[in-house]
Amino acid sequence: MYSTSTVKTRQGVELFLHRWQAGKPLARIALLHGLAEHAQRYDAFAQRLNAAGIELIAVDLRGHGRSSGERVWIDRFDDYLLDADVLVEVAETSAPAGVPLFLMGHSMGGTIAALYVAERAAKRKLAGLILSSAALKPGRDVPRWQLALGKIIGAIRPRFPALTIDPALLSRASGVVEANRRDPLVHHDAIPARTGAQLLAGMTRIEAKRASIALPLFVFHGTADKLTEPDGSRDFEAATSSTDSTLLMLEGSFHETLNDLDRDRVIRALIDWTLVRANLQRSRM
């Protein structure tokens, strides 16, 4: 069953929540979407999870989808961590006790999720971290001077239109690309320089703190991703202190592996991984 609601952050930002409920959930996943998109795009994925007994709860980040806030704008990356905290708190309190909760992030949502686990998850009871095509490292082809210039522009001209996302790079499935282009809730205009600079700052913080992450970890990425760096996922998985980590690299897949030609493979792997860890956690309760 699908339902929506709203909740306000301590800053007064109204966030739009999506919940796909399973009848008797075996596990819950709290999802953080990527830059310039929104959580409703995960409906097909959520239905697959529900069929396996996994509940999905997701939030439109501030400035995205149906949430309030200036479009795709943040003053500091910690603003997104506040949104993540609201999502996790709602997920913890809105389902039956004893159902393990996993935090998942796609693309920039993966940056948020990883940093949240590294810096703030001690007060939460998370059963694992799932990262989909996470933005964890600048692209290998991006010159250092361009990164430095982006930070400067983000400071002195924060709303400068810095970059756009080409929908053709999301998936090899043409229907996915066209649906994205027609979606009025997707932000199709340029991303402000401040938002881009803060995303880079988030990556730097993760690199310094990733060794502290010890949760069970499932990381997957397409090798042909041109929007986020596949090596970022490889390096992150190798650098954490998790003793239960899985890395799945999908040969030839584009950025949205959940919507690409290999989606059945990755969704099945994600479901299997989640249910095994959920069963392990329940056995320890």
Where are these regions (language model features)?
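Short beta-strand/loop motif that positions the catalytic acidic residue
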Residues: 213, 219-221, 225
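N-terminal cap/lid segment of alpha/beta-hydrolase-fold proteins
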Residues: 1-22
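Catalytic active-site module of serine/aspartate enzymes centered on a nucleophile-bearing elbow/loop
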Residues: 244-285
